[in-house]
C-alpha cells in the first residue's frame, strides 16, 4: 500500500490530499480564494501567492488529520510544478520540498494538465483505471480557465496535442462575459445558473473555426478553438440592447443561454470530430469547465456507441490535490522521482510522456 500526499497551488485553490494506491481518496482538502479575487473579476497572481502562503500549512495539516495518519505513514509527496501561475506554484513547491526533506520522503513533480486528465480516474468508483489498455488511444478534452486543449494519448505512453485555443480558453470566455455583464466571479457557475432561465436560440453567436458560417477552416485549425470573437459578439449585442444595466431579466437570461450554447456546441463539435479523425477508443472530458451541466449533458448525448466516454466527477474537475496524489502513484511505482532542483514553470509542453507504457 502506498499513501501519497498531493499538493496543488497552481492558481487560486490551495489543496492537499492523501491518496492510497492512486485510487482511494483518503482525504481531500481545498481552500478556495474566490472571495479574495472576486472584487477584481479574476485571479491576481501576487494575491494568490500570499493567500497560498497563509493556507498551505493548515491545509496540509488538515489533510493528514482527516486521513488519520502522520508523515511517517506516507510513501511520497507529490506537487504540481507546471503549468500555472509561477508565484502560486512556488508556494506549494517550496512547502512540498521542505516537507519531503523533513520527513525523508521522495518528491514527485506533477504536470497539472495531466493531473486534470487523471481526475476522471481517481476515486474507488471510477469505472476504469488510467492504464487500462481498452481505453487507448484516448482523446482527452481539458477545458478550464487556462486550457481548452485536445490531447491524444497513445499506448506507447506518449501524448500528442492536436488542438488548443488560439486566444481565450473556454473558462475565460465565461469569466469575461460575466465581467462584461457585472455578474461576479467566477463567471462559469453564475452563467450556468442564470442560463437555465433563458432560450438557447434567442441569439446567434459565432462558432469560430467550425465552418458553421460557410467559411472554410484551415487544416491546421481544424481542432483548434477561438472564443475571442464570441466575446466580442456578446459585447456588441449588449450594446445594441441598450447596455448591461438596461437589460431585462428575460434579455439577460436569453443572452447567457445563447452564449453558453455556442461554447458548448463548439466544444462538443471539435471533441467528437477529433475523436473520429484519430480513431480513439475513449474520450475524457475534464477540467473546471467540465463542471458545466449543459456541457456534460451535451457531451453524453453526442457520444457515439463505439466510444467509451468518461467525464471527471465535478469534485475532481476543478483544481484539487486528489488528482495530483493519484497520478503520482504511477511515478512512485517506477521510482521516477524528482530532485530538489525541480522548478516551477508557467508553461509546459502539452505533448509529454505518460508515467507508463502499455507496450
List PLM regions with ranges.
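Short beta-strand scaffold segments in enzyme catalytic cores
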Residues: 14-19, 140-142, 148-152
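Short glycine-rich phosphate-binding loop at a beta-alpha junction
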Residues: 71-81, 278-289, 310-313
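Conserved phosphate-binding catalytic cores of ATP/NTP-utilizing and phosphoryl-transfer enzymes
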Residues: 1, 110-138
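A contiguous, well-structured pocket-lining segment that forms one wall/lid of small-molecule binding clefts
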Residues: 193-283, 292-307, 332-335, 352-359
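Short Gly/Thr/Asp-enriched flexible loops that form oxyanion-binding sites at enzyme active sites
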Residues: 79-105, 122-123, 293-302
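N-terminal beta-alpha supersecondary unit
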Residues: 2-73, 79-83
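Glycine-rich phosphate-binding loop plus the immediately following alpha-helix
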Residues: 154-199, 231-232, 236-240
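Conserved phosphate-binding/catalytic loops in two-lobed NTP-binding clefts
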Residues: 109-110, 299-324, 338
Amino acid at each position: 500500500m502506498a499513501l501519497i500526499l498531493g499538493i496543488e497551488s497552481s492558481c487560486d485553490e490551495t489543496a492537499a490530499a492523501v491518496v492510497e494506491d492512486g485510487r482511494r481518496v483518503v482525504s481531500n482538502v481545498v481552500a478556495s480564494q474566490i472571495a479574495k479575487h472576486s472584487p477584481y473579476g479574476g485571479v491576481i497572481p501576487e494575491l494568490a501567492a500570499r493567500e497560498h502562503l497563509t493556507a498551505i500549512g493548515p491545509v496540509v495539516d488538515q489533510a493528514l488529520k482527516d486521513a488519520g495518519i502522520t508523515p511517517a505513514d506516507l510513501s511520497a509527496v507529490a506537487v504540481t510544478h507546471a503549468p500555472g501561475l509561477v508565484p502560486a506554484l512556488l508556494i506549494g513547491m517550496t512547502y512540498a520540498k521542505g516537507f519531503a526533506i523533513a520527513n525523508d520522503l521522495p518528491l514527485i513533480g506533477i504536470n497539472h494538465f495531466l493531473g486534470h486528465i487523471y481526475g476522471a480516474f481517481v476515486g474507488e468508483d471510477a469505472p476504469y483505471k488510467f492504464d487500462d489498455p481498452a481505453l487507448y488511444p484516448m482523446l482527452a478534452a481539458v477545458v478550464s480557465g487556462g486550457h481548452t486543449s485536445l490531447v491524444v494519448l497513445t499506448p506507447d505512453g506518449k501524448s500528442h496535442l492536436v488542438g488548443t485555443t488560439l486566444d481565450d480558453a473556454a473558462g475565460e470566455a465565461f469569466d469575461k462575459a460575466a465581467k462584461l455583464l457585472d455578474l461576479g466571479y467566477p463567471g462559469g457557475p453564475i452563467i450556468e445558473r442564470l442560463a437555465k432561465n433563458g432560450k438557447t436560440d434567442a441569439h446567434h453567436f459565432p462558432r469560430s473555426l467550425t465552418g458553421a458560417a460557410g467559411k472554410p477552416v484551415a487544416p491546421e485549425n481544424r481542432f483548434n478553438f477561438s472564443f475571442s470573437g464570441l466575446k466580442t459578439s456578446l459585447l456588441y449585442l449588449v450594446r445594441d440592447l441598450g447596455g448591461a444595466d438596461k437589460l431585462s431579466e428575460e434579455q439577460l437570461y436569453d443572452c447567457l443561454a445563447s452564449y453558453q450554447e455556442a461554447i458548448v456546441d463548439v466544444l462538443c463539435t471539435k471533441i467528437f470530430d477529433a475523436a473520429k479523425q484519430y480513431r480513439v477508443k475513449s474520450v475524457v472530458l475534464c477540467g473546471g469547465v467540465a463542471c458545466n451541466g449543459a456541457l456534460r449533458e451535451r457531451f453524453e448525448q453526442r457520444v457515439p456507441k463505439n466510444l467509451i466516454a468518461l467525464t471527471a466527477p465535478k469534485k475532481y474537475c476543478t483544481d484539487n490535490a486528489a488528482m495530483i496524489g493519484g497520478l503520482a502513484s504511477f511515478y512512485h511505482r517506477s521510482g521516477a522521482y524528482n530532485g530538489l532542483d525541480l522548478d516551477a514553470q508557467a508553461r509546459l509542453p502539452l505533448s509529454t510522456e505518460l508515467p507508463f507504457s502499455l507496450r
